[in-house]
Each structure stands twice: as C-alpha cells, then as structure tokens.
A protein has these predicted regions:
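C-terminal membrane-solvent junction of multi-pass transporters and transport-like membrane proteins
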Residues: 160, 343-352, 393-459, 494-496
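TM-loop-TM module centered on a large, flexible mid-protein loop between adjacent transmembrane helices
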Residues: 83, 122-126, 197-205, 213, ...
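Selective recognition of specific alpha-helical transmembrane segments in multi-pass small-molecule
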Residues: 56-63, 164-178, 246-277, 357-358, ...
Length: 497
C-alpha cells in the first residue's frame, strides 16, 4: 500500500502536482485513436451514428471516472481498482484485475515502441536506421523517463498531453473556418450531414441496421478512451489527491465532449462518410489518410501530413510512457497487497519501484523480440490483451457499487466523503451494462449475422479466459469468498495530507 510519508524508503513519493494529474487525465482521453481511426467511425455509422456512439461511451467513461474518483479520493493508492476490488469485493478479483491490467500494459508498451518506429520511418532520412533500432531507442527513452522520480514522468506526460491538446484546439478552429469557407476557398456548411443516407447509416436503410452500425462504433470509441483510468493509479503519488483527483474527474466529461464529439462533428461536416479516405490510417505509412491530415491539407496547410505524423509519434510515446508507469505501479502495489512477490515493492530513494520497473521492462523487451521473430505468436499475444481495458472498467464499476453499499451498511455518513460520485447507483450500473455490451459485441459478425468463426472468436475473446484463469487460480488456492458488506475493509491506511 502506498504511503504519504516521503521518509519511508519502501514507499513511492507523493510528488505529482495537480497540473500533472489534470493533464494526464486529458492525455488519457486523446491519442492515436482520435487522430488515426476516428474517420472509420464516421464511415461505418455515419456522422450521426459516430457522434451518438462517442457520446454514449463518453457518458460511460464519465460514470466510471466518477466512481474511480470517489474511491481514489477516499483511498489514494497506486493499486487503484485492483486494491479496491481486493478490499471491497473479493481478493481474487483484485488479484485477477491487477495481473490482467499489468499484462495489458506490458503488451501495449511493446506494441507502442514498434509503432513509434513506423512513425519515424515516415520521414525518409530516418530510414537510415532499421525499425528494430528505433524501437529499442524509444524503449530505452521510456525506461529512462520512468527510472527517475515521478516528477519526471509527470512533467513528460504534461508536455506530451499539451501538444495533443494544442493540436486538437487548432484542428477545431481550422475546421470551423473551413466549414464556413474562410479557409480552403469553398463554403461547405452542413451538406455532408445529409449526403447519401446520412446522418445515420447501416448495411441498409432500416432502423435496426443503423442501430447495429452505431453499436459497432461503440468498440472503436471504447478503445479510444482506454487509459482514462490512469487517474486512479496516479492518486497513489499525488501531492493532494483529495483536491487533484476530483478536479481531474470533474473535467473528464467536458474534455470528452470538446475533444472527441466536436472533433467527430467537424470531420463529419468536412468529409462525407462515403469518402474512401475515412477508411483510416492504420499505420504511419498511411498518415495522409488521417482525417486530421485531410482537414489540415484541404485548408491549405502543405506540411499537414508531416506535422500530424510528429503529433502521432508523441501520442505513441506518451502511451508507451504511461503504460510503463501504470504497469510498474500496479506490480508494485500488488506486492504491497501480497498479490505479488514482496521483492517487487522495493523502491529507490526517489520513490521509483525499481524491481517492478526492471521486471516489467524485461518482459516488454521479450514481447518485442517475439514480435520480431514470430508474427503469429505476437498476434495472439496482442489479441489476449484486447479486452483487458474493458475488464478493468467492469472492475471499477463493481468495486464502487460494493464500496458505497458497504459504506452505508457500516453506518458511515456519506457527507464525510471528500468526493462523492453523482448518480449512484445508476451511474455504475449503466457503466457496467455498457461495458458488457462492448465486450460481447467485439465479434460483430457473430452478433449481427450469427456467423461463427471459431478462430476469430478465440482470438477476439481470448482475454476473458485468461482473466478467469487468474481469478480461479487465486480463488482455488486461497479459498477466498465474496466479502460481506459489514466485513469490508473501509480503513484509510494511506496517510493523505
């Protein structure tokens, strides 16, 4: 368990400032999902369907963040939802969530260093070095940023996120000017909202088809918002979690509204859903297909592709930086909760969990080597992590529901909570249901057409049996049970000052 005493050599340090937490929250919302694949959402469901999907997922994320914010303010710990699940639901759930989340980020970091090499290779002079060399260089940089004090991580993420925020704001301004013909030389207006079958489209014009298409975009939107739960992990090293966490959580909804929904609206107004360009940029080689690049280029910015590639490179590095931070802190916190070996709890004088960092970095490197030597094995490893983020969100909603019920059952006054999530119990229940819908809906052919591709089903849902393996292993070995509400540990053994 993390501790606020900076004199304790075995604990992380509370050196993340409020501005760090707030910007990390923004950075968690903005990434390559917005810059690279947002056009696919419009192409699949039309501008109306895409906006509805992002609003629904945005609402779900808002409820999840308010749930996480209430628990993180009450008990700020780097273990976040893993610790909360262990205390408020079942230790086996906390064990499974923690290892599941660590596993997810380890794979993500390995994928990010590979993607960063692809982004760099967009510029021809950079191709003098092979991809693997660039990947290793970026991995060393990320490890270096995480090996120093948490202030270094906070500062690096602050500037990474600021770059993304500035780009989105400029994009919205340029987009609005282009819509009204001030830039680009042509008035576009709102005609693209009704082109063809827009604003809502499907395989045909029936309402059911349009609804299914919109539900399909839920998956794209859900992946775009992965990482927002980092707010909870940073609580363990926040200077003033009782102030910084609620502040960050309260701003999440508005950030989602501005940065995602308005961006989707601008793209939908400027590029018709029928455009093949909206099929998306799946790699750095296709950066010219990014909807952001297309809008900037149509507005007259000749270097749009190069600039957006630089922004996407910073987004990838930011994701890798945050991923290594999150996985390292999760492993550290699990050791404190006796869900991992005690050696992973060792820290440097700067408060860096050095053993957890080394172990995590080694696994990242091994997965990177697998990617170089066996593409098939790497594909299955990546597939295994596909649902872990959504499973973590399920854990957050369930933990908060149990926390609030236990808090009331034990006779505590809700007014004593320094931050209280609104809309309880409706909020976590809605989030829980939407998470389940997104998880079940991963295989769109199975859901919409009843076509069973067992190889595809195995790859798509591989994360579920892996999570169940962790859960059942711990439950069988330690014979844990659902904690009765009156026995739930509501102590605050984290010294918050």
């Amino acid at each position: 368990m993390t501790n606020n005493s900076n004199n304790n050599a075995n604990e992380v340090k509370r050196n993340l400032r409020s501005r760090h937490i707030s910007m990390i929250a923004i950075g968690g919302c903005i990434g390559s999902g917005l810059f690279m694949t947002s056009g696919q959402a419009i192409h699949s469901a039309g501008p109306g369907g895409a906006i509805v999907a992002y609003l629904c997922i945005g609402l779900m994320v808002y409820f999840l963040m308010t749930s996480l914010g209430e628990m993180a303010t009450y008990l700020p710990t780097s273990g976040s939802f893993s610790t909360y699940a262990s205390r408020y639901v079942d230790p086996s759930l906390g064990f499974a969530l923690g290892w599941n989340y660590w596993f997810n980020w380890v794979i993500t970091v390995a994928a990010d260093v590979e993607l960063s090499a692809l982004a760099v290779s967009y510029w021809e002079p950079m191709r003098v070095l092979p991809h693997w060399a660039w990947s290793l260089l970026f991995l060393v940089i990320i490890i270096g940023l995480n090996s120093l004090s948490v202030k270094v991580y906070g500062e690096s993420e602050y500037w990474f996120a600021l770059i993304k925020v500035v780009v989105v704001i400029v994009f919205l301004i340029v987009g609005c000017l282009t819509i009204f013909g001030i830039l680009g030389g042509e008035y576009i207006g709102f005609k693209n909202l009704t082109v063809g079958d827009a604003p809502f489209i499907g395989e045909d014009t029936s309402l059911s088809s349009q609804i299914l298409a919109t539900l399909g975009v839920f998956l794209i939107a859900g992946y775009s918002f992965q990482g927002t739960e980092l707010i909870g992990i940073t609580a363990g090293e926040s200077e003033e979690p009782e102030k910084s966490i609620p502040k960050a959580v309260k701003q999440v909804f508005w950030r989602i509204l501005i940065f995602y929904v308005l961006a989707i609206l601008v793209i939908g107004l400027l590029i018709p859903y029928t455009s093949p360009d909206l099929l998306g940029a799946e790699s750095a080689e296709e950066i010219a297909k990014s909807p952001f690049t297309i809008v900037f280029k149509n507005a007259g910015f000749a270097l749009a592709a190069s600039v957006m590639n630089a922004v996407i490179l910073t987004s990838i590095l930011s994701a890798g930086n945050s991923g290594l931070y999150a996985s390292t802190r999760m492993l550290y916190a699990m050791s404190k909760e006796k869900l991992a070996y005690p050696i992973f709890g060792r820290v440097t004088k700067y408060g860096t969990p050095v053993v957890s960092l080394i172990a995590t970095s080694v696994v990242v490197f091994l997965i990177f080597l697998i990617q170089l030597t066996s593409a098939n094995a790497y594909t299955y490893i990546v597939a295994a992590s596909g649902l872990t983020g959504f499973i973590a969100w399920l854990g957050i909603a369930l933990s908060h529901y149990r926390f609030r019920r236990a808090y009331v059952a034990q006779g505590k006054d809700l007014n004593d909570l320094k931050y209280r999530a609104k809309w309880f119990p409706l909020g976590p229940i809605i989030a829980l249901v939407l998470c389940i819908i997104v998880i079940i809906g991963q295989d769109t052919e199975l859901i919409t057409k009843g076509i069973v591709n067992w190889s595809g089903v195995l790859t798509t849902y591989m994360g579920v049996p892996i999570f169940l393996f962790f859960f059942l292993y711990h439950k069988i070995r330690y014979k844990t049970k659902l904690i009765p509400l009156d026995k739930v540990d509501l102590s605050q053994d984290v010294d918050v000052k």
